[in-house]
């Protein structure tokens, strides 16, 4: 049964008024809580004829995220289209500079512009404006609108909205940037690395159910990061088993070293690149 009911609350009304003014819109859905919640809200508010949703298939997108989009689209009755944004044909993206996201989003929005007759919309929220987000420049270049930002919604507001929509699986979904963010700045983005990262993180999730996990490709080797509580609970046998799994997934990187550490946000990003 398709979910079509929406009950506006004092919390969601400002966002609804903004989206109603857009008329037809195309939403880029990554599989994360922000864009997925926005997609469900806009679709229930305006209907299938007014809202198109697009998901980019890419080695940088976890398989679980694509499956999540497909499942939600079926449950909600979305008008969903899968596309290849072509970022892997862009050498500027593959070089993995500090502003890699600019090139990724440029390719995405160029692709969406060719499909859309309405307004392009993203799931960017107000908290995102506090970070270094080169993708926002690409969005500005393509006249992409950010309804969460316009409504003053931060991440907590988005999670609250997901709960209001009866989507607890989204409200509890941890943040997870694209897989390319796990590769240290300056190391070329390779399909094999991203597939290995996805495999390792999926396996760790199934084995240890951590609150947070990142498999990072660094110049010094592979770094497995987990939230401190999960990491402290790993015994030597757990670490050995995990290391063996990592090496199996990264066979294309012979003699690589595997290390473990507590999760540190953005630790594959070399901020000094900004000064060069």
What are these regions (language model features)?
Residues 88-89, 184-186, 229-231:
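A short, flexible beta-alpha/helix-coil linker loop
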Residues 219, 223-238:
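A short interface-forming secondary-structure element
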Residues 149-215, 262:
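Mid-to-C-terminal catalytic subdomains of enzymes
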Residues 212-214, 221, 257-259:
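Residues at or immediately flanking beta-strands
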Residues 204-211, 249-257:
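Short secondary-structure junctions
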Residues 2-164, 222, 240-253, 264-276:
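ATP-dependent adenylation/nucleotidyltransferase module used to activate substrates
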Residues 54, 216, 225, 259-261:
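Solvent-exposed beta-strand sheet faces enriched in polar/charged residues
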Residues 120-123, 172, 178, 225:
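Short, conserved beta-strand edge motifs with alternating hydrophobic and charged residues
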């Amino acid at each position: 049964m398709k979910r079509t009911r929406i009950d506006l609350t004092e919390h969601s009304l400002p966002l609804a008024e903004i989206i109603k003014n857009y008329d037809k819109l195309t939403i880029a859905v990554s599989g994360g809580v922000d864009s997925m919640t926005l997609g469900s809200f806009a679709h229930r508010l305006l209907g299938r004829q007014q809202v198109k949703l697009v998901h980019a298939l890419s080695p940088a997108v976890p398989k679980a995220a694509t499956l999540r989009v497909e499942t939600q689209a079926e449950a909600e009755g979305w008008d969903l289209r899968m596309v290849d944004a072509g970022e892997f044909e862009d050498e500027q993206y593959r070089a993995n500079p500090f502003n890699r996201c600019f090139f990724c989003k440029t390719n995405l929005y160029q692709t969406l512009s060719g499909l859309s007759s309405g307004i392009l919309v993203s799931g960017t929220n107000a908290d995102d404006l506090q970070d270094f987000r080169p993708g926002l420049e690409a969005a500005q270049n393509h006249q992409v609108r950010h309804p969460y930002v316009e409504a003053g919604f931060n991440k907590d507001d988005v999670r609250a909205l997901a709960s209001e929509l009866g989507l607890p699986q989204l409200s509890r979904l941890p943040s997870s940037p694209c897989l390319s963010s796990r590769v240290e700045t300056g190391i070329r983005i390779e399909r094999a690395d991203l597939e290995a990262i996805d495999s390792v993180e999926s396996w760790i999730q199934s084995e240890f159910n951590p609150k947070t996990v990142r498999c990072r490709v660094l110049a010094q080797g592979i770094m497995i990061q987990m939230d401190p509580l999960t990491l402290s609970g790993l015994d030597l046998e757990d670490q050995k088993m995990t290391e063996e799994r990592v090496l199996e997934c990264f066979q294309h990187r012979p003699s690589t070293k595997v290390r473990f550490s507590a999760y540190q946000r953005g630790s594959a990003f070399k901020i000094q690149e900004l000064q060069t």
